[in-house]
Amino acid sequence: QFGFILHHRVMLQQTDDKLAVVMIQETKDRFENLVGSSFDRGFYSPENKSQLAEILDYVVLPKKGRLSVKDKEIEQSEQFVESRRKHSAVESSINALENHGLDRCLDHGLHGFERYVALSVLARNIQILGHLLQQKELKKQKRREAA
């Protein structure tokens, strides 16, 4: 909603489709008001689709490969398309992490890498919070000047 990164994980010999449900369950435990989530095609599996539908009110999980008529209808629905457009913000956050130093880890070992990733996510969230506070203050100033 506000662009914060709510969950991160360093994956070791794991694929996206094996982690989707676990990742959402952990996030839902921390953020009980989470109602929906958007994923890449790599996260799709029939099991993920059904299990995630039980956890969340709305799941955007595009199917891999050729779509059936029913799946095509679902993926062309207005809500699905709108959510997919918003998914670019997720990709943008990942890109921002890379642009602000996560593309090259200066720590050594797995523990150092995990720490580096966690601190990068924290720094990005602080940056987003700062931007939101600046925007709020800017709106206040514009209202004062208009009055």
Give the location of each predicted region.
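Anion-binding and metal-coordination hotspots
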Residues: 1-147
